[in-house]
Amino acid sequence: MAEEQEFTQLCKLPAQPSHPHCVNNTYRSAQHSQALLRGLLALRDSGILFDVVLVVEGRHIEAHRILLAASCDYFRGMFAGGLKEMEQEEVLIHGVSYNAMCQILHFIYTSELELSLSNVQETLVAACQLQIPEIIHFCCDFLMSWVDEENILDVYRLAELFDLSRLTEQLDTYILKNFVAFSRTDKYRQLPLEKVYSLLSSNRLEVSCETEVYEGALLYHYSLEQVQADQISLHEPPKLLETVRFPLMEAEVLQRLHDKLDPSPLRDTVASALMYHRNESLQPSLQSPQTELRSDFQCVVGFGGIHSTPSTVLSDQAKYLNPLLGEWKHFTASLAPRMSNQGIAVLNNFVYLIGGDNNVQGFRAESRCWRYDPRHNRWFQIQSLQQEHADLSVCVVGRYIYAVAGRDYHNDLNAVERYDPATNSWAYVAPLKREVYAHAGATLEGKMYITCGRRGEDYLKETHCYDPGSNTWHTLADGPVRRAWHGMATLLNKLYVIGGSNNDAGYRRDVHQVACYSCTSGQWSSVCPLPAGHGEPGIAVLDNRIYVLGGRSHNRGSRTGYVHIYDVEKDCWEEGPQLDNSISGLAACVLTLPRSLLLEPPRGTPDRSQADPDFASEVMSVSDWEEFDNSSED
């Protein structure tokens, strides 16, 4: 008894924890579930504690009732749902083969399933009967690993028989990815017309050009030889031609098709597509499902900028973050502008670059504007601004694009211009009450907000809101810190102000503080600060994450290729794939790009100093810090 009392005293713990961090802990074993399965398998192998016999095709299989009930809804309903099988020692199983039942029981006891071409169908039938989703998924994945042009129709029939929507989607994806080759097979013409119509209507259809869709629609009704020899009748066009997006075809191809067609509904459709090409300035206002890109790849894209190499170069290249590779790639298009710090807007998946800087030999503000069409990878120069705007902000509100304030390197501006894509024209709207440049803008709930910037040599922390309905500006609460040459983004009904610099310390320093504005409360707050300086950054929002691209750091005294991504749910920054060079003044956005661009092999960047005689005049041999003199950020 004395020993017992002594032990109790030695082990006595306080009734209440005195340490503030002392709390109850829960421990979880990562090995417990597998150990439990091994124990149950050992019981099965030893023939211990069996309490039910399954009778399948006249053969007996012993099992543990509680494990079966825990494994799937079918057995749970049988053994725990008040049915007569609860009391039976032997239970008859219908609609399942003996071999498949053995396979499924092995999976229940081990979590392992061995599939082959000889057993997959009967295993799938049994899994559907017994309602075991995991085994159904395994069988579907196994079938997909063996799908080819010869057996795909059989697998489609299997998916339809058991209502396997996931398998049907996988088969659809197989055809969408291999459409050009599959459309030249006999099996293609054996698919139901409704199925082919659905596939040809999909944005996920992988083709290099819309002409391949046109040919695929014809190949459902004609042989390849007939299509190639033009031995087809289009007076009453096949229904599948309704899925062809004729405006996405090249104008030359459309013209040849139009010239050989007799008067018919199809000829009228082709004529409308030709008119779309001829009215290039009005294309953004002529958008319809017929002009939608066949792609679901939304990418962060950056245009222009000025980058640091052995010399300082204004870029006319675009770069995009390839979602398949997780790295930055370049693409080029003819007549691309070569500038930096341009205002950027996206409307109907067209990119607009507005004004900006052409600071090659001194400071020069721009009034010229461009539009990029990813459907045809072409640039088009639209109507110029009515005056030059550098260090401006650009926003889309409704169907209009607004260019707000800035400077022309002689005067600071308060002018606001509005662009109407339907008329390709600019018009002045209500100006700001005072001049501002190097500010940033964003749109939220049909209104336009601009923040901070500079006026003369002074850094600002002002916030202004434009209401297009009343054509008026309103002043809101000041932000928490002065800054200029920063970026703004709208995310989850809040405005974020990111990056930039100020001289509050008596000299130019990066601003790491990130400010968040709530339109509901009208108040500013601070969130997780930037891990590095980003002045003149590119800003884009994709999948509820803010991308901050490149820029320049006054703390480091250089441009940067860093990419930082803000996760609003976790309130933290993470590093993204770094840009391939240090660049500032990048105009960034999110754009749907064609699959052909993302899937084509990477190409090297040509040496334009050899290919372009004008290129040499745009190169300056100065140090990395000295070339900041020609940056927008003075």
UniProtKB/Swiss-Prot annotation:
Kelch repeats: 299-349, 350-399, 400-446, 448-493, 494-544, 545-593
Ranges of compositional bias, category Acidic residues: 624-634
Gene3D superfamilies associated with the record: 1.25.40.420, Kelch-type beta propeller, Potassium Channel Kv1.1, Chain A
GO cellular component: centrosome; Cul3-RING ubiquitin ligase complex; cytoplasm; cytosol; intercellular bridge; intracellular membrane-bounded organelle; lysosome; microtubule cytoskeleton
Subcellular location, principal: cytoplasm
Disordered: annotated span: 600-634
Compartment(s) where it occurs, according to its Swiss-Prot or TrEMBL record: Cytoplasm, Cytosol; Cytoplasm, Cytoskeleton, Microtubule organizing center, Centrosome; Cytoplasm, Cytoskeleton, Spindle; Nucleus
Pathways involved: Protein modification; protein ubiquitination
Protein name: Kelch-like protein 22
Further remarks about this protein from its record: Potential oncogene that is up-regulated in breast cancer cells and promotes tumor growth.
Subunit structure: Component of the BCR(KLHL22) E3 ubiquitin ligase complex, at least composed of CUL3, KLHL22 and RBX1. Interacts with PLK1. Interacts with DEPDC5 (via DEP domain); the interaction depends on amino acid availability. Interacts with YWHAE; required for the nuclear localization of KLHL22 upon amino acid starvation.
Phosphotyrosine: modified positions: Y466
GO BP: cell division; cellular response to amino acid stimulus; cellular response to L-leucine; mitotic sister chromatid segregation; mitotic spindle assembly checkpoint signaling; negative regulation of autophagy; negative regulation of type I interferon production; positive regulation of cell growth
PANTHER family reported for this sequence: KELCH-LIKE PROTEIN 22 (PTHR45632:SF5), LD33804P (PTHR45632)
